[in-house]
């Protein structure tokens, strides 16, 4: 019953979803969830062509997307990092360079995906992906888990002397009205030089 319920929830999330045992503790105990996921992953390994549940690493699974040309695809570093943080009960924020790339302020793709976290500094290898987690101060993690956090990190990448109207415009367009309200509220916890920039973003029509 537990295995069936877990499988239904996974399939309901759709292909590309990544998950950990902690995502299913409302269904059963940790031991029973571990057993169910292991059983589903073993079934998927035996029936690779069906694209069932796949074990990515210890305590980390996915329901892989499929491409007509390339077959089952590997999950993105961003999705993996979020799942790892969720599994370990940590908060997560992209590094300044990653945030700038995500918001279109930089075309440079970091060679190694790096995330700031309230957990220990470590490197996590999942399949071909090598992801760096760096312990950061609470001020660096303001807005973590929201678009606002990505904006603050992107501003760190740009720097106070390089912010112009084009950057303000791009950042403003990345946020909806609720995001802008949250940005204004959270800005009290970021460096003072960001305050006037945040005001411009919030006021942007």
Feature annotation, model-predicted:
Residues 20-21, 112-114, 167:
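Short coil/turn segments at secondary-structure boundaries
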